[in-house]
UniProtKB/Swiss-Prot annotation:
It comes from the Bacteria. GTP binds at residues 170-177, 195-199, 217-220, 288-291, 319-321. This is GTPase Obg. Residues 164-338 form the OBG-type G domain. The lineage of its organism: Bacteria, Bacillati, Bacillota, Bacilli, Lactobacillales. It comes from Lactobacillus delbrueckii subsp. bulgaricus (strain ATCC 11842 / DSM 20081 / BCRC 10696 / JCM 1002 / NBRC 13953 / NCIMB 11778 / NCTC 12712 / WDCM 00102 / Lb 14). The gene is obg.
């Protein structure tokens, strides 16, 4: 397992898919055919950026020092109507359990929960069309081709939620890490002070009857965790993935705490988590540290308080030091994991998709929406995502391309809107990196 200083469960990155290759302006010049017509091929598709879930990874550490990723552009079109070669996609491995969000809107883009699952987070631009596509009866030798479409650019937030069948929850220093070290091969840091566990520790529990399940020792909770106090939201995020909660309450009579109040506080924080009501998960109540003198009396009072508040659950007594109750507790946890898995399988009405690759489709308006901003006297800027892409795909090195763009802008109503904003002949108009003089 990584050390506390290297565990990374949340990060921000930028992804830039590859630009499509430019279409080509070319003509056939074969023997006996000096004016053989257009023969410029299309550009190749730009590389997409694809996340791949890999269960060999445990953290988002790979994204800690490298935050910008760029795929290759497609190859330009060629002569003799030959297409340019498509660029290779850029695959980035992430841990299983990674959720991807748009950094600015907070919208969830995808959730990678299976090994090998893929998610296209930035799609490569399509190749521009060569001049073979623009021949008409009027213009049989078009000097026009499209530039490749820009690849998608996104700023993303990656969030790792540990995938564990069983999660150990409770106040700091109730024995969660000790239990994990006893029942698995995990080696968590253990000490008698708050927040020793600053990251989830994960291990596998193997029972004598052949059953197994994964268990996570999660950072300790305190009052107000659902609002971010202490390790707060960082902790609760990881509880989301668990099937069963082992709710550990210390029976140490010397810690000055009331066992039922601790139990109720943790339950309240689980229920208050804004993403999901975590208190609805299957729970086993565990009375920990039963080897400490005076623990029996505190346990008796805890059971009375539970009954008085209508909590009708068995309390499992545990000492990780003497191993009292460990086997029985692990067997019960395995039973509940199996029950939850059976319920999930029954609830799954749709068959599992064979294709594991998902492409996230970002919203694009059906119409080319745009706005006109007056920057200063005689200066205007036009904004609009699709309009800017149209300009970027226009080959401005050829007069035919410029005239075609002008016609499309006029049909879209750009000229009318500029006039309505007070534009006159000779005013400067900007669209992305492109500028032109307005002519009425």
């Amino acid at each position: 397992m990584p050390t506390p200083s290297t565990f990374v469960d949340q990060t921000k990155i930028e992804v830039q898919a590859g630009k499509g290759g430019d279409g080509m302006v070319a003509f056939r010049h074969e023997k006996f055919m000096p004016n053989g017509g257009p023969a410029g091929g299309d550009g190749g598709r730009g590389g997409s950026i694809i996340f791949v879930a890999d269960n060999g990874l445990r953290t988002l550490m790979d994204f800690r020092y490298r935050r910008k990723f760029k795929a290759e552009p497609g190859e330009n079109g060629r002569i003799k109507a030959q297409y340019g070669k498509a660029a290779k996609d850029l695959y980035l491995k992430v841990p299983v359990g990674t959720t991807v969000y748009d950094f600015f809107t907070g919208e969830e883009i995808g959730d990678l929960v299976e090994n090998g699952q893929e998610l296209v987070v930035a799609k490569g631009g399509r190749g521009g069309r060569g001049n073979i596509h623009f021949a008409t009866s009027v213009n049989t030798a078009p000097e026009i081709a499209e530039n490749g479409e820009p690849g998608e650019f996104r700023t993303l937030r990656l969030e790792l939620k540990v995938l564990a069948d069983v999660g150990l929850v409770g106040f700091p220093s109730v024995g969660k890490s000790t239990l994990l070290s006893v029942v698995t091969s995990a080696k968590p840091k253990i000490a008698a002070y708050q927040f020793t566990t600053l990251k989830p520790n994960l291990g596998m529990v193997l029972l004598p009857d052949g059953r197994d399940f994964s268990m996570a020792d999660l950072p300790g909770l305190i009052k107000g965790a659902s609002q971010g106090v202490g390790l707060g939201i960082q902790f609760l995020r990881h509880v989301e993935r668990t099937k069963v909660i082992l709710h550990m309450v210390s029976m140490d009579p010397n810690n000055g705490r009331d066992a039922y109040e601790d139990y109720e506080t943790i339950l309240h924080e689980l229920a208050s988590y804004t993403e999901d009501d975590l208190s609805s998960k299957r729970e086993i109540i565990v009375a920990s540290q039963m080897d400490i003198p005076g623990a029996d009396e505190k346990l008796a009072q805890f059971k009375k308080d539970l009954a008085a508040h209508g909590v009708d659950q068995e309390v499992y007594e545990l000492s990780s030091v003497t191993h009292q109750g460990v086997d029985r507790l692990m067997s019960r946890a395995a039973d509940l994991v199996s029950e939850v898995e059976a319920q999930e399988a029954e609830a799954a009405v749709k068959p599992k998709e064979e294709v594991k690759t998902k492409t996230y489709k970002y919203h694009r308006p059906e119409k080319m929406e745009f706005t006109v901003e007056k920057l200063a006297d005689h200066e205007f800027e036009i904004h609009g995502e699709q309009l800017e892409r149209l300009v970027a795909m226009t080959n401005l090195d050829h007069q035919d391309g410029i005239m075609r763009l002008a016609r499309r802008l006029k049909r879209m109503g750009v000229d009318d809107e500029l006039r309505a904003q007070g534009a006159v002949d000779g005013d400067d108009v900007y669209i992305g990196d492109f500028s032109f003089e307005f002519v009425q």
